């Protein structure tokens, strides 16, 4: 009989360490930030003067 406790690895399934989770989330976050900054276009702030009054 095989028991699995919530949050614990099951036999045959490798568990991910906390360091691996942290670094994966950091990499994903940096990739998302780069994608956001690389988007073309003009920021929308309700004016075409880039935040300066006319």
From Swiss-Prot:
It comes from the Viruses. Acts as a host protease inhibitor that allows the virus to initiate latency. Following infection, prevents protein cII degradation by inhibiting host protease FtsH (cII is a factor that initiates the expression of repressor cI, the major component promoting latency). Functions as a competitive inhibitor (and thus as alternative substrate) of host FtsH and thereby prevents binding of cII substrate. In turn, stabilization of cII transcriptional activator allows protein cI expression and thus initiation of latency. Keywords: Activator, Viral latency, Viral latency initiation and maintenance. Changing residue 21 to P: Low cIII activity. The keyword Phosphoprotein does not apply. The keyword Cell wall biogenesis/degradation does not apply. One of its GO terms (biological process) is viral latency. It holds the Pfam family Lambda_CIII. This is Protease inhibitor III. Transmembrane segments: none annotated. Belongs to the lambda phage cIII protein family.
């Amino acid at each position: 009989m095989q028991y699995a406790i919530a949050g614990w690895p099951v036999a045959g399934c490798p568990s991910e360490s906390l360091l691996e989770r942290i670094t994966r989330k950091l990499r994903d976050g940096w990739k998302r930030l780069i994608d956001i900054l690389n988007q073309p276009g003009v920021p929308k702030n309700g004016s075409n003067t880039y935040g300066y009054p006319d």
